[in-house]
Amino acid sequence: MFKKINLKNKTALVTGAGKGLGKACAIALAEAGANVIIISRTLPDLTKVEKLIKKTKGSCLKFECDVTDLNKFKNILKKIKKLDILVNNAGNNRPEHFTQVKKENMEYLVELNMKAAFNVAQICSQKMVKLKNRKKVGGSIINMSSQLGRVGAPIRSVYNMTKFGLEGLTRGMALELAKYNIRVNSVCPTFVETPMVKAFFKNKKFKKQVLENIPLGRVAQENDVSTAVTFLAAESANSITGTSLMVDGGWTAK
């Protein structure tokens, strides 16, 4: 029998939670009963998300932090009593043709999408394994990857590199954290109707090319991704680890 997702008494941390997918995931986890910790660089955005979560009678703590600031993130984790779920979501993209990629853009994407993702996952894992009954209660880490962690795409070589790296990290982490009953998976969305994608879609030619590459013929919605994340966070996914949940409308099936 299918059980309704219940994350009561679980503490979930979501990075990049000020808008887009992070915001959607934070609200969905709170609606499922989790105590949610939201992190973003922009305090006004966090305050808006906090209000939305409290409207659902959910529990929420907010911290303004750039996840590339390792020491600041470590200090935040010291203030948290326990952690059961991590949604490692913070990331960005700066599309450029490979031959014209600016050094500063490449370094920025590697710093955020790879190094910060690694550091956040490591620091949170260290916190999670310290819980005495961790093996009994389990834990879940969800790395927000992309369909472009599985296939290439024009003008996205650096983004490809960072997301392929995150896919590899997900599998390595899954093997090493399994003994603590901490599951590690990634969610790989196609283009999702977020503020960032809406900006890209101002280019009508690009939007047409994207839709032609999605067999279902439509971009994903934020709710499609937050539902996948909530599923992986819950007991319903107890035997799922070291894999990727594709939310890509069939893009990578071709």
Positions of predicted regions on the chain:
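Substrate-binding pocket helix/loop in short-chain dehydrogenase/reductase
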Residues: 97-98, 102-110, 210
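Active-site loop immediately N-terminal to the catalytic Tyr-X3-Lys motif
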Residues: 99, 151-157, 179-180, 217, ...
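Short, small/polar-rich loop/turn modules that mediate ligand/substrate recognition or access, typified
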Residues: 178, 183, 240-242
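Residue(s) in the substrate-gating loop at a strand-loop-helix junction
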Residues: 146
